[in-house]
């Protein structure tokens, strides 16, 4: 859990923004999204393979020169 020091001299909005940024950096939001539903290991591999294929196709399109 990210921790921040709240300075009483600064507005609360700045501290809240810093906390949100720290949570984003720690990956808490992504972790919650991932744990919302259970995904079987085979499904994880299938998703990863599909992402790798699409990434390779994108790289091939980008590197193709006329």
Swiss-Prot record:
Quote the cellular component terms of the Gene Ontology held in the record. ribonucleoprotein complex; ribosome
RNA-binding among the record's keywords?
no
User: Residues annotated as region Disordered?
Assistant: 38-66
InterPro entries with a match to the protein in the record = Ribosomal_bS21, Ribosomal_bS21_sf
| Keyword Membrane set for record | no
Instruction: Give me any GO biological process, just one.
Output: translation
Q: Which domain of life is it from?
A: Bacteria
Q: Which UniProt keywords apply?
A: Ribonucleoprotein, Ribosomal protein
One of the record's GO molecular function terms: structural constituent of ribosome
**Family listed:** Belongs to the bacterial ribosomal protein bS21 family.
Please give the name of this protein.
Small ribosomal subunit protein bS21C
Q: What are the top taxonomic ranks of the organism? A: Bacteria, Pseudomonadati, Pseudomonadota, Gammaproteobacteria, Thiotrichales
The gene from which this protein is expressed is rpsU3
């Amino acid at each position: 859990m990210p921790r921040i020091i709240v300075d009483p001299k600064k507005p609360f909005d700045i501290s809240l923004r810093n906390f949100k940024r720290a949570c984003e950096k720690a990956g808490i939001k992504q972790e919650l999204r991932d744990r919302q539903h259970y995904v079987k290991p085979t499904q994880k591999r299938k998703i990863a393979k599909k992402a790798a294929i699409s990434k390779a196709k994108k790289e091939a399109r980008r590197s193709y020169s006329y």
